[in-house]
């Protein structure tokens, strides 16, 4: 399965391109990629970039897919799925837990569903820590054409989704969902 790192955001709350911000001597996005590469189920890592940051992302030596739509995570996932089934994460998720990702991919492969998404008991989804079939791209395309850009709503509208109940999983795996939004968040990973 492809590991797709979404790297097309604008980093408004961070104040600068957070994915290029160096933490312990390397850019944030590389911390995320290294964790993803630690997954036995991931055969190839790609970066989904915006047209504006394509060149910066190409510097890391990974295949870069450009999200020309840049309408949010929905178009990033849409772009990633052009290459096949993918496990999608945000580029600002440096605490990914490879065992958890492998678990989700195994559930996805065994389920035969169009997507496998972690879900909290209150219904909140973790769509940027999920496995998607390339066939989910058709659903995304239809929603994008209608101007419906919320990835969570696209997932909820699909009838063939595997949901993983987060509360039933090891407590430590929840750290995998952590993402950096503001500079204050960096203390969690700089220790």
UniProtKB/Swiss-Prot annotation:
Entry remark concerning the domains of this protein: The N-terminal domain determines nucleotide recognition and specific binding, while the C-terminal domain determines the specific binding to the target protein.
Family: Belongs to the MobA family.
Domain of life, source organism: Archaea
Reaction(s) this enzyme catalyzes, per UniProt: Mo-molybdopterin + GTP + H(+) = Mo-molybdopterin guanine dinucleotide + diphosphate
Cofactor: Mg(2+)
Gene Ontology biological process terms in this record: Mo-molybdopterin cofactor biosynthetic process
Organism (species): Pyrococcus abyssi (strain GE5 / Orsay)
Range of residues in the leader sequence: none
Record GO terms (molecular function): GTP binding; metal ion binding; molybdenum cofactor guanylyltransferase activity
Cell location: Cytoplasm
Protein name: Probable molybdenum cofactor guanylyltransferase
Enzyme Commission identifier(s): 2.7.7.77
Residues that hold Mg(2+) according to the record: 92
């Amino acid at each position: 399965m492809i590991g797709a790192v979404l790297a097309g955001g604008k980093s408004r709350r961070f104040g600068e391109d957070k994915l290029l911000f160096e933490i312990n001597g390397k850019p944030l996005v590389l911390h995320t990629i290294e964790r993803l590469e630690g997954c036995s189920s991931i055969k190839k890592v790609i970066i989904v970039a915006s047209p504006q940051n394509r060149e910066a992302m190409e510097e890391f030596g990974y295949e870069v897919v450009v999200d020309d739509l840049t309408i949010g995570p929905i178009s990033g996932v849409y772009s990633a799925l052009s290459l096949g089934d993918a496990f999608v994460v945000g580029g600002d998720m440096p605490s990914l837990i490879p065992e958890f990702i492998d678990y989700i991919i195994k559930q996805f492969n065994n389920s035969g569903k169009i997507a496998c998404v972690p879900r909290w008991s209150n219904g909140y989804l973790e769509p940027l820590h999920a496995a998607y079939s390339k066939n989910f791209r058709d659903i995304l395309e239809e929603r994008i054409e209608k101007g419906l850009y919320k990835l969570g709503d696209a997932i909820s509208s699909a009838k063939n989704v595997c949901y993983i109940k987060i509360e039933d999983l090891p407590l430590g795996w929840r750290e995998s969902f952590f993402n950096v939004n503001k500079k204050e968040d960096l203390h969690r990973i700089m220790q």
